Amino acid sequence: YEARPSFTFEKAVDTYNHLLSAAEAATWTLSEIEEHAASKEEPQGELGIAYASLRHREWLSWQERRMQQRNKWREFFESFDVVLLPVTLTEAIRHDHSSPFTGRTVQVDEQKRPYTDQLKWVGLTGVSWLPSTVVPVGQIDSKPVGVQIAGPFLEDRTTLAAGRFLQEALGGFQRPHGF
């Protein structure tokens, strides 16, 4: 059974990336914003400085896109209580604290991907302000794997209840070997 809202994953993630970068830029000085706006550097991992220098008019356009996606999620949840989604692209990984953030990579199926790709699935729901609950559902090579349970706006208890049901069905949390 495939349940999907009536917008593309790519469109939702693009909206998330633009709005997240613009929000991060709120802590920058005016000279930093101007420097980034003048930069010809392309966004790295679909998330980068080029998005951070949005003009207010552009930001409003991205906000409108967010609201349209929220409406499509609302329509989706008229037929479904929750939706199950990945949390990230892989099982749990060792955290990388090297700098810069946009230069980090993660290995996915023997291919290096931008570290920021790990944000895509939480961005899909987060950009529309949907509650989500993450529960462990198994392990790969002794590393935990989780599932994201997303639900309608302001229905946090729905996702928590679904998480409890799923945990009961799967036998609860199993501590990975070595932890």
Task: Give each language-model segment a name.
Residues H18-R74, T90, H95-S98, V134-P144:
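Short helix-loop capping/hinge segments that flank enzyme active sites or metal/cofactor-binding pockets
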Residues Y1-Y16, A50-S53, E58:
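Gly/Ser-rich, acidic/histidine-flanked active-site/gating loops
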Residues A12-S21, S99-F101, Q148-A150:
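Short low-complexity, flexible loop/linker segments enriched in glycine and/or proline
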Residues V87:
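Glycine-rich, N-terminal phosphate-binding loop of Rossmann-like dinucleotide-binding domains
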Residues I93-L119:
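Short, surface-exposed loop/helix-turn segments at secondary-structure junctions
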